[in-house]
C-alpha cells in the first residue's frame, strides 16, 4: 500500500515536467515561416520611343547608258515608333528619315542618293534584356543623275525589309544594330548596316 502511495506521489511530481516537455516538442515541430521573396519588376517594351542612327550603305544603281554603278557611303538619321507587347511578343510600327551621302561617277554619269525614309511594321521576341526583331514596309529615296549636261532628280518609292537586335541599356535608354535591304523599283538596290541609340518614353 505504501509502495502504491509512493508511485502516485512521484507521478504527480513529474507531471508538470512532462507537460512542459510536450509543449516544447510541439513548439519545435512547427515549420519555420519562409522569408518573403522580392520579385524584380518585369521590363516592358511597350510604349513610344525615338532615337538616332548611323550606318553605311552598299548601293547598286542601274542606268540605261553606262550599266550598273555602285555608290557606297555613310548615312544618318532619326527614327521613332510605338511598341505593343503581349507576353513575350512585341509588335508595333516605326518610321525613319535620314540622309545618304552615297555618290559615284562612271563614264561621265554621276549617281547620287540623298533623302531617304521608310514606314515599317516590326515584330520581335522579348529575351529580356534584349529583343531580336524583324521589320518590313515601304521606303522612299531621292535619286539624282547627272551626266554633265542634264541633271535629273526623282523620288523613288519601293520596299524595305530587315532584321535587328535591340538591347535595354537602362530603363529608358535603348541600343540597337540593324540590317536592311531596300529596293527602289528597278533603279536602285541598297544594303546597309545601322547602329542606333534611342530613348523609351
Swiss-Prot record:
It holds the Pfam family OMP_b-brl. One of its GO terms (cellular component) is cell outer membrane. Residues 1-23 form the signal peptide. It is found in: Cell outer membrane. One of its GO terms (biological process) is symbiont-mediated perturbation of host transcription. Its main location: membrane. The keyword Amino-acid biosynthesis does not apply. Keywords: Cell outer membrane, Membrane, Signal, Transmembrane, Transmembrane beta strand. Has a C-terminal deletion compared to that of other Brucella species. This is 25 kDa outer-membrane immunogenic protein. It comes from Brucella ovis (strain ATCC 25840 / 63/290 / NCTC 10512). The lineage of its organism: Bacteria, Pseudomonadati, Pseudomonadota, Alphaproteobacteria, Hyphomicrobiales. The gene is omp25.
